[in-house]
């Protein structure tokens, strides 16, 4: 009984959101709605200034992230263990 009530309520909420979104003329409405619901801006990508584990690199340049080092043999960043 509780599960069916929850399912019915979730269906009504979904129907309301879809109906409201179809009336909206803005193309970015779903992204704006989700960012307001979760109060985070996860839809904008961020560029990292360094290269992480397994990324290609050039030995001698400081391209890898902290605690990583560029392997002279394989030419990719790997974890630096301090040896």
Curated annotation (Swiss-Prot):
What GO cellular component entries does it have?
Answer: extracellular region; host cell presynaptic membrane
Q: Which domain of life is it from?
A: Eukaryota
Query: For the modification Leucine amide, which residues carry it?
Result: 81
Q: Which UniProt keywords apply?
A: Amidation, Disulfide bond, Ion channel impairing toxin, Knottin, Neurotoxin, Presynaptic neurotoxin, Secreted, Signal, Toxin, Voltage-gated sodium channel impairing toxin
UniProt-annotated location(s): Secreted
What are the annotated disulfide bridges? Answer: 50-65, 57-70, 64-77
| Tissue-level expression | Expressed by the venom gland.
Q: Which residues form the propeptide?
A: 22-48
Under the heading InterPro entries, the entry gives: Huwentoxin-1, Huwentoxin_CS1
Query: Could you tell me one molecular function GO term of this UniProt entry?
Result: sodium channel regulator activity
Q: Which residues constitute the signal peptide according to the record?
A: 1-21
Family membership, please give it. Answer: Belongs to the neurotoxin 10 (Hwtx-1) family. 15 (Hntx-3) subfamily.
The domain section of the record reads:
The presence of a 'disulfide through disulfide knot' structurally defines this protein as a knottin.
Q: Give the multimer and partner information.
A: Monomer.
Q: What does this protein do?
A: Lethal neurotoxin. Selectively blocks tetrodotoxin-sensitive voltage-gated sodium channels (Nav). Does not affect tetrodotoxin-resistant voltage-gated sodium channels or calcium channels.
Question: What is the designated name of this protein?
Answer: Mu-theraphotoxin-Hhn2f
- Show the taxonomic lineage: Eukaryota, Metazoa, Ecdysozoa, Arthropoda, Chelicerata
């Amino acid at each position: 009984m509780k599960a069916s009530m929850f399912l019915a309520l979730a269906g009504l909420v979904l129907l309301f959101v879809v109906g409201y979104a179809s009336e909206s003329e803005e193309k970015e409405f779903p992204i704006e709605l989700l960012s307001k619901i979760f109060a985070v801006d996860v839809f904008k990508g961020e560029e990292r200034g360094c290269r992480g584990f397994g990324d290609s690199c050039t030995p001698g340049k400081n391209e890898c992230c902290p605690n990583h080092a560029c392997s002279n043999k394989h030419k990719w960043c790997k974890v630096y263990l301090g040896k």
